């Protein structure tokens, strides 16, 4: 309960950094989450996606997670012949990109900061030169790294790393201002929560647990100006039913994410894309991939059919 109490304090006091102005997400938007381990593990948590659906009932948002642990803004290794990100974003007809970078890059320290800024600028320029949805450049939301939590020995305490992380977060903020993008600062609210002794919020100092993802999801929603759509925070009457409805949405989101992960990152890419694609993969896998596409689309329909509930951002207590 201490985490939830601190979360309420955070949402009451934290000054939003992003100024999205007009609503960021529109009817039927197709959203892509890209980036590092933080982005990839969002698919196992589902809280931010659930909040997006709750804040946009009837919008039929279609969200795909393309996060890949270890990805950097300029370094994204893939298996042999793996489909490039541009093709994936085009296949999804992406309207909005939520990009989570900066944590991996921060380990290059001050020496890597200028290069990161240049690479991020180039990445933004490249994305905006594309029309993945067939008509307009994608709207881009930059999401900063969280702070480094001190979990005690044998893990690093993160004191020096946080000084460096702050510089990388500032570089991302400058890039967002330069390109007129929405910027979400997760470093400040997570560091403030850690300084207040809430937690643990991570499993190893830098990768969130369920409580950390709850804090991140609520902070992202707050900075995107979505919380006004999410109702009251009471735990009686309709609010209980609303939380149950939101839990059902989250379960449907997690089921969809699992199906899409099997489509986007099949277990044996050597047969799907690689050196054993011929003669075996070319015979078996195209039909399997088509079927998975159909199942993922059906999973979207399930999410859209559920009442989102008028909920608080405190979605779940349990860890995973």
Model feature map: region roles:
Residues 34, 46, 78-118, 148, ...:
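Oxyanion-hole/transition-state-stabilizing segment in secreted/luminal serine hydrolases
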Residues 54-59, 131-135, 179:
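Short helix-capping segments at alpha-helix termini
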Residues 150-186:
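Substrate-gating cap/lid alpha-helix
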Residues 26, 43, 200-320:
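Conserved catalytic region of serine esterases and O-acyltransferases that act on ester linkages
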Residues 44, 48, 81, 85, ...:
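Stable alpha-helical elements in mature extracytoplasmic
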Residues 4, 8-69, 84-93, 97, ...:
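Serine-esterase "nucleophile elbow" of acetyl-processing enzymes
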Residues 100-104, 127-165, 237-238:
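Active-site segments of SGNH/GDSL-like serine hydrolases
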Residues 37-41, 68-74, 96, 103-108, ...:
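Solvent-exposed loop/turn segments at secondary-structure junctions
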């Amino acid at each position: 309960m201490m985490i939830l109490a601190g979360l309420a304090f955070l949402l009451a006091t934290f000054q939003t950094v992003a100024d999205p102005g007009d609503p960021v997400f529109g009817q039927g938007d197709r959203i892509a989450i890209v980036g590092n381990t933080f982005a990839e593990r969002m698919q196992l948590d589902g809280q931010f996606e659930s909040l997006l659906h709750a804040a946009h009932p009837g919008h039929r948002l279609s969200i795909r997670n393309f996060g890949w642990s270890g990805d950097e803004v300029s370094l994204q290794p893939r298996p042999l012949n793996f489909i490039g990100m541009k093709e994936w974003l085009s296949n999804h007809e992406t309207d909005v990109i939520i990009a989570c970078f900066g944590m991996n890059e921060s380990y290059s320290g001050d020496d890597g900061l200028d290069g990161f800024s240049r690479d991020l600028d180039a990445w933004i320029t490249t994305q905006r030169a594309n029309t993945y949805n067939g008509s307009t450049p994608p709207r881009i939301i930059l999401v900063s790294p969280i702070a480094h939590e001190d979990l005690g020995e044998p893990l690093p305490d993160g004191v020096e790393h946080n000084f460096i992380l702050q510089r990388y977060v500032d570089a991302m903020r400058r890039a967002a201002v330069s390109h007129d993008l929405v910027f979400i600062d997760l470093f400040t609210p997570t560091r403030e929560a850690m300084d207040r002794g809430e937690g643990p919020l991570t499993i190893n100092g830098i990768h969130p647990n369920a409580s950390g993802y709850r804090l991140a999801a609520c902070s992202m929603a707050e900075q995107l100006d979505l919380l006004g759509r999410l109702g009251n925070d009471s735990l009686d009457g309709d609010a209980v039913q609303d939380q149950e409805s939101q839990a059902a949405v989250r379960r449907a989101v997690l089921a969809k994410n699992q199906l899409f992960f099997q489509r986007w990152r099949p277990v044996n890419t050597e047969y799907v894309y690689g050196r054993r694609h011929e003669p075996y993969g070319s015979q078996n896998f195209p039909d399997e991939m088509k079927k998975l596409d159909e199942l993922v689309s059906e999973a979207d329909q399930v999410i859209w059919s559920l009442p989102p509930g008028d909920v608080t951002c405190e979605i779940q207590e349990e860890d995973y």
